[in-house]
Amino acid sequence: MTDTAEHFRIETDADNIAWLHFDKSDAGTNVLSQAVLEQLDLHLQQIAAQCPRGLVILSDKSNGFIAGADISSFTKLKTSAEVMGLLETGQTVFNRLEAMPFPTVAMIHGFCLGGGMELALACRYRVTRDDPGTRLGLPEVRLGIHPGWGGSARMVPLIGSIKAMDLILSGRSVDGRTGKRMGLVDRVVPERHLRSTARSMV
């Protein structure tokens, strides 16, 4: 069974696992805008109502998982209320994802940065492709901003304050194997095992 929408596609397989495919329309890279977040929230509510065995979030873009927030949309924010609205939307969506009553897995390849990393941290588990091109991090400081969707708060208890602050304050990214050693991700596997591993985690 499939359900298509502008940026997302839900696939529920024979084992009642929901696969949420992210493929931002008219874009070469997955980024998170206000509209994308609102659509994601609706899909999460729909999936929660279906009570699947688990949820796997993955990207249909060949170049990576999610690059982060849609930076181009920042210039359209004219008031502090609009800024707060974007922050609150992201926090609401990721809190909903974190509170899902079944296992959730971020299936990561390529870049998983900024808001993409924050989304992955809101999942119960994270599995990455074993590839030097896999990059995990919160580079917001390099833009003069701070992670605003709960990523820093979720990262600290996961990997400890020292390692988390190093990543957050430097803005540097790490590959999957380094992320596994730090405790940032749970599994690092070859591409051919990525989907089966994600399935096994739910």
Question: What are the roles of these predicted feature ranges?
Answer:
Residues 113-168, 182, 198:
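CoA-thioester-processing core
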Residues 15-23, 35-78, 92-109, 129-134:
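A structural preference for short, pocket-lining loop segments at secondary-structure junctions
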Residues 79, 160, 190-191:
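Helix-capping/helix-break motifs at membrane-protein junctions
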Residues 78-88:
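A short acidic, glycine-rich active-site loop
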Residues 57, 70, 119-120, 179:
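Hydrophobic/aromatic residues within transmembrane alpha-helices
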Residues 1-23, 169-202:
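Amphipathic alpha-helical segments at domain termini/boundaries
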Residues 68, 84, 91, 114, ...:
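Glycine-rich phosphate-binding loop at the start of an alpha helix
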